[in-house]
């Protein structure tokens, strides 16, 4: 491995550690031969998921996403791109059969989301489920592919884990978005119509409804565990942080503004989270 590529991969690992720590711990449970791909893919997700949040102007964030959309095409055409995550992805794609479809679908979902007006909220929970599928489940599909795991059952479980994780993380992000524009862009209209979002009780009711959908996906994923190949189960360990976050939401009565949500790792002590993750990994669960 060249020094340049090693530097790019180290950058990916550090980005995941800095900005997605609970998933960083999940990736450490993967077999060594899968970690390179997994960290590169997760770093790509960080680049696209943070593009709008770190931009001083939404137009700059959108330009960044469009750049990544174009970069995926270039990577699959074996063109060199001067960006550490792109270089790591290029190496992964040259060594493994990773579908371009999943990467494109992920960044295109982010682009479509970035182009929404503040007042243009999703109409149904199903729309948010599709967004979670497109941005989170696709990441798990790509990781399975990079590990040479071809299993319909694993893909099916990954779909549900991704939806559970994606929905839970959208709920966690609600205070951030409310602080930026005073709105809750990830509470769909059909849910908002059943609750009064400008009251604490109403918002908690909406969060409970959406958290219940996320939990149902997690239960469906775990119901498939008996058919999922053993080598795929560690790829699905993001089900653990999803469960932890949903459980923390339950403990704070689904109040996303409760400061306990930001303590430790997803609201629990770091050592407890790591022990739970290790236990699930050792038992072949997710």
PLM segments and residue spans:
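Short, flexible active-site loops
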Residues: 122, 145-148, 195-200
């Amino acid at each position: 491995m060249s020094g340049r590529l090693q530097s790019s991969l180290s950058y990916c690992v550090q980005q995941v550690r800095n900005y997605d720590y609970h998933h960083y711990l999940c990736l450490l449970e993967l077999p060594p031969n899968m970690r390179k791909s997994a960290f590169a893919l997760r770093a790509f997700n960080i680049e696209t998921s943070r593009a709008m949040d770190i931009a001083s102007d939404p137009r700059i964030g959108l330009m960044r996403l469009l750049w990544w959309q174009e970069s995926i095409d270039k990577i699959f055409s074996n063109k060199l791109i001067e960006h550490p995550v792109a270089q790591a992805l290029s190496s992964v794609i040259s060594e493994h059969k990773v579908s371009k479809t999943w990467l494109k679908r992920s960044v295109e979902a982010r682009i479509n989301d970035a182009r929404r007006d503040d007042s243009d909220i999703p109409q149904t929970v199903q729309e948010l489920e599709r967004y979670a599928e497109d941005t989170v489940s696709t990441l798990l599909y790509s990781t399975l592919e990079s590990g040479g795991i071809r299993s319909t059952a694993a893909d099916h479980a990954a779909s549900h884990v991704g939806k559970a994780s994606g929905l839970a993380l959208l709920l966690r992000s609600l205070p951030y978005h409310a602080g930026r524009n005073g709105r809750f862009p990830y509470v769909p209209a059909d849910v908002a119509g059943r609750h009064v979002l400008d009251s604490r009780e109403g918002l908690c009711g909406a969060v409970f409804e959406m958290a219940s959908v996320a939990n149902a996906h997690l239960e469906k994923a775990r119901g498939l565990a008996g058919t999922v190949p053993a080598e795929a189960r560690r790829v699905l360990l993001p089900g653990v942080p999803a469960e932890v976050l949903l459980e923390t939401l339950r403990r704070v009565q689904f109040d996303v503004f409760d400061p306990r949500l930001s303590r430790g790792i997803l609201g629990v002590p770091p050592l407890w989270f790591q022990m739970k993750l290790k236990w699930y990994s050792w038992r072949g669960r997710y």
